[in-house]
Amino acid sequence: MKATWKPAWHTEKRQPQFAGTDRPPTGHTPFGKKKYLMANVPALDLLNLEQNEGADVSHDLRLLFAASRDLGNVVKTLAGIPTASTGGCEVMINDRDFDIVARNAILLLMALYFEADSAPLTMLHLWYSALIPAQILRAIQENIRPLIQDVCAKIAAKRAGSFQAKKWTYGTRSLRLVLKKEEWNRLLSYFEIPDGLSMTQVHAIRTATTLAAERRDYLDRWLYILPPARRVGAMKFRVEGILLPFGSCRRDFDTTPNPTFFQSKDSWPMVDAADPLDGWSMAEILRKAPLARNDTYRGLFLLVQDTLQRFCQRIENLQVKFQLFHDDALALPNMIEDGQHSFDRIKLSNMADRGWVGPEAALITLAPLLKRASDNPHAILLTLFLNAVHEVFYDTDNIASLHEEMSRLRSYVNLAPDVVLAGDKFNADFIMFTDARPVVRDFDKLFDRWMREHRFGDIGKAVGLKMGSEHTIVPPWPMRLRQNATQREFDRLRASGHVESERYVEWKSVE
């Protein structure tokens, strides 16, 4: 796409499809099935040992990913354990979405079963690519599927609805998977392409969501904020759904859909904007491909492959026990043996958001699982709030902050005087300018308001937790534009799939 490209609604001088719609607080209007098979916030190292227990920690650590989504946080955390650390690690992973649990189970079995030098690339494509090489499908069908088939055969006579557990051990590593009987049988379908699903249908099913005609203006709106050189790569992924560097040969990806995505012959399981870029730090992505900064999918490919390589190599020499559950996070205290005050880290994803279970229910239920400060002063329960500040941003705030935000925004976005004078609210440059207001917004006051409304102080006291004054896992606002940011930093953040208002809170025991 040329640098002079404009969205279709702009050149056709018409009202865009998104005009007049009731947009959600974050400004992202979703379209398609709402499965979160790929993360929508960057993966983080939940241990960050050098800033906490120390790089040479010798005691065992216990981690709980209560609403895990994909494996990004698990992989990044274990890949980051220093070689000087001699302690073991027990990792419990749960999600209430069976599609997520099934994919995570298969990926972990691949990491344990296959050699560390061959597993990363196969894991990468099963994780992110809509189409995969036929040899990857054969590899999991011939090596991983029999592991599940063996369990299904052994539990055939068990009562429907009963929980059944299986533990696989490979050297110092193990994986224990707990599912209901019928879920074990269902897991086998993730190794099979639906009968009669042709490649023509595969393309049509996916692009009916990712390139939907009724979303043309939404797509153009997103493309317009990208640097011109990035738009071609972005569209290539929208069309193909294959995670590869831009110029890489795709011949091996012509015949085989990824069965962990295509469980149905009727629809694509995710929203149109679902993108693997959202699950990793853009700064790290760009550092991976410094000579091809506009090929962000190349940078992502190299980053994920490298992280998976380090993950697979690290767990080869680590006493690590994985446990996978498929349940509501609020039921975990009843599922986990010896759970009371036993975890060094607990990650709740954004389940404490008001739109999910809320902060009170989340903390009352899961705070008792966190180690006391007397046992580990670095033990942390991590909550993420994606929507909090938008829920308390009222019309009066929108008016009151207008002048300050516009003034700061003009430092980064040049809106031509003739665009302003024309008064055309559907001008693409005017829309891009006004859409960027949240990037420069002061969210601290809004989050303070949200915490007061939800009685954070009272909840913390009730469950024996306090908010950490200094974060040692992740900054409170990791995606927010810093003061005196450069133009490059602004452009990078604006072009990301994040809403800039992601707020983390680190909780510690008061005892």
Feature annotation, model-predicted:
Residues 1-511:
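Domain-level detector for long C-terminal conserved domains
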